[in-house]
Amino acid sequence: MLAIHGWHWGTIVQNKLHRNINLIYGLAFFHSFMIIVPVIVPFFISKGLSLAEIFYLQAVYASTIVVLEAPSGYFADLFGRRTALLIGSVVHGIGYLCLNFADDLFSLIVFEIIVGISASLLSGADLALLYDTQKTLREEGTIDDGKGIAHLGFIKSSAEGLGALLGGALALWSFDILVVVQALAAWMCLILALGVVEPPYKKESQGVDHLGIGRILKHLLQGDPLLRKIVIAIPLYSLATFHVAWLMQPYWESQGISLSMFGVLWCSQSLVVALASKFGFEIERRHGAAYALT
């Protein structure tokens, strides 16, 4: 009887973990479904901001992410990835809700800080949950697919592309409606995060956890040169990507390109990234990570 009960309970857990994968994919989709990003510069200009103030806003956003990237990862390890997802999703929704009422530089700075906090909490938490979920299912012999990370990248980039098309169309109609739709998409992250379960993963004892951040920083700064370079490269790459993105939009506007075409152009580059994510896994599997990065 106990064996039957144990088998039944194990089946329930497996079903929840399998459902986890789809929920994480869905959450990643709506988190990346940023319909406002392809027209963010014209949107800020419509609020009366100069180009210098717009870049100041992006500096605030990028700085928030860089400062909180490591602490948010430690928070997720300490309190659980699901907790980080839930809090990040709530903050994400609040941020875009506040954007509906932001009309000056100060309120937009507050918005950038809020969404920067949410991006730090959500960044990596979905990936870690997906990895732990698939690792558990592989150990139990119920899944043998190692392409989950590649699929996650493909879904995120595809969401950016689809969001860009919708954002370009809505921007022609009304920025106010665009922001409302963006807020609704943001709150979808919380709805999906509520269904996610925490997969089992190795966690250090409570006594060690208090020393964990010091040991992690020491290992990062002194122990592993490759890891140190990766940690430095990731935020620098993100910052460079942000600034190129914000520079392109004023250039497009100066060339007389319509807002609807902003969405088409942004969608095109997002689809290229999606395809690279899709096939990058095979390149890495066959030739190694160093070759793929090169």
Question: Language model features by range: what are they?
Answer:
Residues 14-67, 225-267:
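Helix-loop boundary and gating motifs at the non-cytosolic
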Residues 113-157:
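Cytoplasmic helix-loop-helix junction between adjacent transmembrane helices
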Residues 160-181, 250-256, 282-283:
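Transmembrane alpha-helix termini and helix-breaking/packing motifs in multi-pass membrane transporters
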Residues 177-195:
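Symmetry-related core transmembrane helices of the 12-TM Major Facilitator Superfamily/SLC fold
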